Amino acid sequence: MSWDDAIDGVDRDTPGGRMPRGWTVAARLRAANDDITHAAVADTLPAYAELHCLSDFSFLRGASSAEQLFARAHHCGYSALAITDECSLAGIVRGLEASRATGVRLIVGSEFTLIDCTRFVLLVENAHGYPQLCSVITTGRRAAGKGAYRLGRAEVEAHFRDVVPGVFALWLPGDQPQAEQGAWLQRVFAERAFLAVELHREQDDAARLQALQALAQQLGMSALASGDVHMAQRRDRIVQDTLTAIRHTLPLADCGAHLFRNGERHLRPRRALGNIYPHALLQASVELAQRCTFDLSKVQYTYPRELVPQGHTPASYLRQLTEAGMRERWPEGAPANVVAQIDSELELIAYKGYEAFFLTVQDVVRFARAQHILCQGRGSSANSAVCYALGITAVNPSETRLLMARFLSKERDEPPDIDVDFEHERREEVLQYVYTKYGRERAALAATVICYRGKSAVRDVAKAFGLPPDQIALLANCYGWGNGDTPMEQRIAEAGFDLANPLINKILAVTEHLRDHPRHLSQHVGGFVISDEPLSMLVPVENAAMADRTIIQWDKDDLETMQLLKVDCLALGMLTCIRKTLDLVRGHRGRDYTIATLPGEDAATYKMIQRADTVGVFQIESRAQMAMLPRLKPREFYDLVIEVAIVRPGPIQGDMVHPYLRRRQGYEPVSFPSPGVEEILGRTLGIPLFQEQVMELVIHAGYTDSEADQLRRSMAAWRRGGDMEPHRVRIRELMAGRGYAPEFIDQIFEQIKGFGSYGFPQSHAASFAKLVYASCWLKRHEPAAFACGLLNAQPMGFYSASQIVQDARRGSPERQRVEVLPVDVLHSDWDNILVGGRPWHSDADPGEQPAIRLGLRQVSGLSEKVVERIVAARAQRPFADIGDLCLRAALDEKARLALAEAGALQSMVGNRNAARWAMAGVEARRPLLPGSPAERAVELPAPRAGEEILADYRAVGLSLRQHPMALLRPQMLQRRILGLRELQARRHGSGVHVAGLVTQRQRPATAKGTIFVTLEDEHGMINVIVWSHLAMRRRRALLESRLLAVRGRWERVDGVEHLIAGDLYDLSDLLGEMQLPSRDFH
């Protein structure tokens, strides 16, 4: 039986979905009847517009996407479809796109349930009504916590008092209609209030229809037909029921009245509707739909203009700031080509009307710099000479090849994207500046839509179907990363599940339906939307989970569709590290540097990089990057740009990496079909490694800037099912017309397709390469300050505090060792600090590297406020004894225990056992009367070496004593297990047996199930490659080991060393209770 057969029955004759095999024959017949083609009888069917329909953005209520709903509405011949998600417009832009694709007109609306249980739908009539609806939604959402809303009648009335409503209101009577609710709605909306008659083939439909018509007549309201639609097709009922169970956190079997009685809340064929509703009610829905003339695509958006001083236009002020920036960037005068580029860009920016947007980004960057917050622009904006002149980006246009079309062009529809990184610890200051500058009414973060993935979906679905927790865990593991290319049915069978079991079939079928189904809104990582008018007139605003944060209900794709500009204020840990390192270098070593003034093209720094001595630096610290460095051997800045970009899915999938390396190493000749291509690809040896190069190639062949940008977007969409064939045909024709060989054209197009996977634009890679060089220079020349800054910037990066300290203490042939001193309550501050050493005077007299004193921030369970009290009390006068420390720093029992466990009292009372005893007896030893003799200190033996190391890792996360593997080395020798030093003496291809502490597990998307594991022993790190078949066979050892033993083949090629695993087994028992940090699958 095939996998599709096992999980689902698929009806290919109708748009949209799958029908679980567990359905009855009657259900199948009903679903089939839904989809009878209406072409032959179209003229005899009643017209209809659905005015009450929830999409999947009514989270855990709506079962179908806007795309599915509009496809179904088109199939059924509806004249219009209203998307009316509950107190939300989060899915409305997707509705707009689906409307465009199908030709079914979109009506914008929203459903509400007030605190007194009055239910109604608001439909937008015109441009005046849209901001009214957005404001009502915003009021309800801002009055409640994340994901909820709260609205009363008073709030609704306030929005429509003294204004002409631009919306229609549909009253949704309950099972027991309360006439008073309809009367209230009519008082607020007058003749714009309607009574919605919703019938779902239940026993009392006839009586309900009669009662509602009578009620409408009594109230003087017009009645119309609507469907309370929750799904596109009847077959989706099982999905909708499951969502209901998830929403109520109940098993399906216990949901009872929470579930709908039948599957009628779908988009029904007009024939079926004609058999249920009087023709007049159906016609009334069409007539009201015709009155709703609002077009969402016509929403007008204006960017703030208050940054423009009096006497200036936005264009003139932007030019003034740009020219001032040019003088600062090029004191001797900018090169002529740069001046021309800037003039061209300013003209284009003015043509597109984006001047105020650039001014806003410049203002945010100016604020950050004034507060000494490191920041740097990246992404496609680094193609802009104006951004460089304004200080937004750091890529000098006189030193690199820019392609403005990658960022902005006259024909390009989407708005420009400017990403700016800020120190991750201080980014909140920047966000709050934006809120303060523009007001919370005009600034909010974009949303991110959190969707179900396989593992999260199967957990929720299996729980809804009543599967026991242990079986849920087993089933969820089948969707985990560690399954390689094993077919799903095999994974499930191997986990012990019966694929013939109808319950398992239903769970799996619903899980497949819920993949990529929206689960809830979250906040974007930093994309700010700022408007000249209140944002709630443009899009609803709601509270984020974090305090003092608000988000709009649209995500970045919605913003692009609606042509809204966002400023991306992103957080980058390495900027925090670099700023703290530069402060330490300035304060302790007497060297005053910025990123821009660090000595460039330093041979010693590149030598360190070539040896892959890059633990803790930016971007090139991963195992994959480290494996590339000895092969690529960067010698100059542009090599770092290539290094940043080449270890990405795009170049790997496009088979660009190995040809580039062969050419770089001289194993393959470099040739170009024309001087024009050589100008574009010369620096990358004929291989297109960057998106800009692809765009330049096709522009050179004959594409316009706009067509080249469309190719870029097609590349991004190709992996998601987009069509590249039209581009293949066009590129082949254009390049053949220039005389290029078919082999070259095919090679280039395959490489272009590789960019369908994630790849960096050159501008982005160049921006990141600036930080790569800065962090590497600091690591090479100021290793103590760099390690200290890196520790103080945690959590960030690939490596734990333990690995950072081990690397600093170990040093390398290219880098001095750093002494690290333990945490000490008499000497440590909150942050790690530098002590001793000798300041730098010149390159000839570089001074002496200081030591690092570990800070109290490293102590688990100790808060910064407690440490502030300790440091303040210590500054007043030295602590006389433990009792004095506890009294003057007001240490509670938790803090006392944390200090004792961390060994931070060594200089006061001695070993850990003595510290524990002293802290435990602080209260008991306090004299009852002044002058009473103190109890004599008890001398306790020190813990054994293994116990000390265990306690270090438990309390501080690292140890300055022996490495755990050094303690275990005698046992390793007995087992004939090698250490790194012995391993490095072995020949390439040798069979070896090693073991180490697991510090990282990685599974790149391009690795086809291969797992990369990093082991650590007392001499360094060992890279292990585990093929997918072994990963499956030794899954438990691979995933759960703290101490992993590996038998395999040692390989050493071009300076790259790794171990190909042949077998794995777990030796964690040798570590006892020791828990070690491991960074897994990030």
Swiss-Prot record:
Matches recorded under InterPro entries: DNA_pol3_alpha_NTPase_dom, DNA_pol3_finger, DnaE2, DnaE2/DnaE/PolC, DNAPol_HHH, NA-bd_OB_tRNA, PHP_dom, Pol/His_phosphatase_N
Enzyme Commission designation: 2.7.7.7
GO cellular component: cytoplasm
A Pfam entry, by short name: HHH_6
Keyword hit for Zinc: no
GO BP terms: DNA repair; DNA replication
Keyword Protease applies: no
Catalytically driven reaction(s): DNA(n) + a 2'-deoxyribonucleoside 5'-triphosphate = DNA(n+1) + diphosphate
UniProt-listed SMART domains: POLIIIAc (SM00481)
Top-level class of the enzyme under EC nomenclature: transferase
Subcellular location: Cytoplasm
Main localisation: cytoplasm
The protein's role, per its UniProt record: DNA polymerase involved in damage-induced mutagenesis and translesion synthesis (TLS). It is not the major replicative DNA polymerase.
Protein family: Belongs to the DNA polymerase type-C family. DnaE2 subfamily.
Name used for this protein in its record: Error-prone DNA polymerase
